[in-house]
Swiss-Prot record:
Residues 95-97 are annotated as: Interaction with target base in tRNA. The gene is mnmA. It catalyses: S-sulfanyl-L-cysteinyl-[protein] + uridine(34) in tRNA + AH2 + ATP = 2-thiouridine(34) in tRNA + L-cysteinyl-[protein] + A + AMP + diphosphate + H(+). Pfam families: tRNA_Me_trans (PF03054), tRNA_Me_trans_C (PF20258), tRNA_Me_trans_M (PF20259). It is found in: Cytoplasm. Transmembrane segments: none annotated. Disulfide bonds join 100-196. ATP binds at residues 9-16, 35, 124. InterPro entries: MnmA-like (IPR004506), MnmA-like_C (IPR046885), MnmA-like_central (IPR046884), MnmA-like_central_sf (IPR023382), Rossmann-like_a/b/a_fold (IPR014729). It comes from Burkholderia cenocepacia (strain HI2424). Belongs to the MnmA/TRMU family. Residues 146-148, 308-309 are annotated as: Interaction with tRNA. Keywords: ATP-binding, Cytoplasm, Disulfide bond, Nucleotide-binding, RNA-binding, Transferase, tRNA processing, tRNA-binding. GO terms for cellular component: cytoplasm. This is tRNA-specific 2-thiouridylase MnmA.
Amino acid sequence: MSKRRVVVGMSGGVDSSVTAWLLKEQGYDVVGLFMKNWEDDDDGEYCSTRQDWIDVVSVADLIGIDVEAVNFAAEYKDRVFAEFLREYSAGRTPNPDVLCNAEIKFKAFLDHAMSLDAEMIATGHYARVRERDGRFELLKAFDHTKDQSYFLHRLNQAQLSKTMFPLGEIPKTKVREIAAQIGLPNAKKKDSTGICFIGERPFRDFLNRYLPTKPGPMKTPDGKVVGEHIGLAFYTFGQRKGIGLGGSKSGSGEPWFVAAKDIASNTLYVVQGHDHPWLLSRELVAGNVSWVAGEPPADGFACGAKTRYRQADAACVFGGAATGAAAAGPAGEVRFSLAFDDAQWAVTPGQSAVLYDGEICLGGGIIESAATGQPGQATSAGHAPALAEAR
């Protein structure tokens, strides 16, 4: 009887290496697949994959599996990077890891794995898949400190039905122990941080290679000019560092934060104080929705939600139809709203709002706008809250 073939996405890191070893130990026919998603020619200094490939080959030799490399750089540029630039150009702050998982790691990679006669694919993500009543559920990892379901919320039933997450029930500390015990050559390799194509350089330097600077005024909510920004794309909501303002502009001494952008006037609005009303939101509207089960929760469903990675679930109520002044976005597009029990800090257009029912990840959407802590005010990627100077 032939063994079930599983193709493992191997990055050269500890997590995917231990994933491959665990599946081999469980008796699967394991094939490693290394994905090259960025061409070295595009940026040889920051994104060389040479060492990662060497690590993958070394691990494959140790545990006794075949491995191959596949180039998805063209798909990555078309499906992920182009959207990344479009979002920043529109004043939003996208999360390319979410799109990469949906379009590359669990679409292009999955399709290629099936061409290798695989029954399943596996990755080193910290999450779980459970089949119940004929449907597949995406669950948080047992190790909540490493849970990555937020980045996986756009996966659908077809993708989950072919996916395994062997590390979902193992603490990260145990994964490191396993790597050391079996003598993996990359056992002490640091976890990757950030986005591959950005590398370790300052994010602003990278973005400036693709988006032009367009300086404009930096204003307070009452319209006072306190500085000049280099371009709205280079700032994100809640940003504190890199603004170029001290605490002396108003004499309060409190730090400054980016609070809003107005694309039409090319104005960046900043406020002083972490808990300024312009930084606090009780409601949001999200579009470009995706539900793991293929359908949304019921209107009025009480759930938890994250508006950024590593955030604790925030209690909220789901609304299936976005209404009111905050309902920005293309006419006819399916959107949803969330009303939070407690005000959320720096809810950022372009990031994902991901819903949870306890351990179950329901799906989510891309944040389009958020109502601020002041009645009747909302902020979106291109519009600041109602301004004092305009009242």
